[in-house]
Amino acid sequence: MIIKNASHEITAVKPIQYPVTGFPEIAFVGRSNVGKSSIINTLVNRKSLARVGSTPGKTRQINFFDVNGEFYLVDLPGYGFANVSKEMKASWQNLIETYLYSRKENFLKMVVMLVDIRHSPSKDDIIMYQWLKGFGLDTLIIANKVDKISRGQIHVRINDIRKVLQLDDAEKVIPFSAENRFGLEKVLAEFDNVLSIPGEEQKD
């Protein structure tokens, strides 16, 4: 996949505001400090398409980004942010749940769940992953911040993530770095696989 252009399409807080173009969608979820916005910017080769907040937990809406005029990357609110009220957490959960329910049948092709490769998945990560699988959604795990560990530790950390999340052999975990683009081509290849956009040829 070659990403030629990307732009912010719309910010939504309820289904009536979602895009109506019919484009397929790939959604991103992750803890509020995992670098979700930075990963999206790296994938589309833009420095500030998705806004990187100075305070974790900044994303409180759903942001749709048009990629190549063919599909959307969807930035969902971060979870696991401690310094917010229970009411706010419930509001964000409802925002995510409403999106998943309304888009999973016709638009949502994959959910990308982001974790920090340096640490074992948290209780919130485990709950989120089980929740996504309960929806029957195709889920890809991206283990970000691989630039913060040695090459020799990558395999060890990936195995730990697989064990904690109880992944089967068919479920993929891709080590990634938003800083140096490590793993970029593998992630884009996964996007090719699920999108099957006419005229696109999968590249190694």
Swiss-Prot record:
GO-annotated molecular function: GTP binding; metal ion binding
Domain EngB-type G: 22-197
Sites where the protein binds Mg(2+): S37, T59
A Gene Ontology cellular-component term: cytosol
Cofactor requirement: Mg(2+)
Family named by the database record: Belongs to the TRAFAC class TrmE-Era-EngA-EngB-Septin-like GTPase superfamily. EngB GTPase family.
NCBIfam families: GTPase_YsxC (TIGR03598)
Name of the protein in its database record: Probable GTP-binding protein EngB
